[in-house]
Amino acid sequence: MGNKKVGVFGATSLVGRCLLPLLVKSGWNVKAYSRREVNSTDPGIQWVQIPKSPDDLHGPACESDQISFWISLAPIWILPDYFPMLVKYGARRIVVVSSTSIFTKSHSGSAEEKSTAPKLSTAETRLEQWSAETGIEWIVLRPTLIYGRGMDKNITEIVQMIRRLGFFPLL
């Protein structure tokens, strides 16, 4: 493998499962973080289970294992808890996945959906402020919908219905 290193939060997410092999194929050494324990011997990927407290990740190992490039696929509102760790790792650039729900859910009839928009907005603002303070380059990607590989129940059911019926009824 090359000397290029990238840290990935949310590595077991749908996007993570698709992205990690592509990173390795492109010559990156990946340090993959997940809340779940992952027992894998994928070449080019070092798995790390995120502890309940981000403080447990801020040890001396961060300072000896410099990682300049980061990708966050985890819910953006947990990312600020890991800002100190990213600084210790020597982060220089970070790509973060958020959501267009920051705009579309603020007027939702669902209280749960409505509460998502301010969480996204607050986290994006904190990312922008932290990046300005630390000089870390950042970009936020806001997809409308992420689905595929049979992992999204609603989309999977729709696809199965279309395959079975040959059409999708719209009411």
Where are these regions (language model features)?
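N-terminal Rossmann NAD(P)H-binding glycine-rich loop of SDR-like oxidoreductase domains
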Residues: 4-26
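SDR active-site strand-loop-helix element
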Residues: 9, 33, 73, 94-100, ...
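Active-site Tyr-X1-5-Lys
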Residues: 114-139, 151
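Flexible, glycine-rich beta-alpha linker
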Residues: 139-157
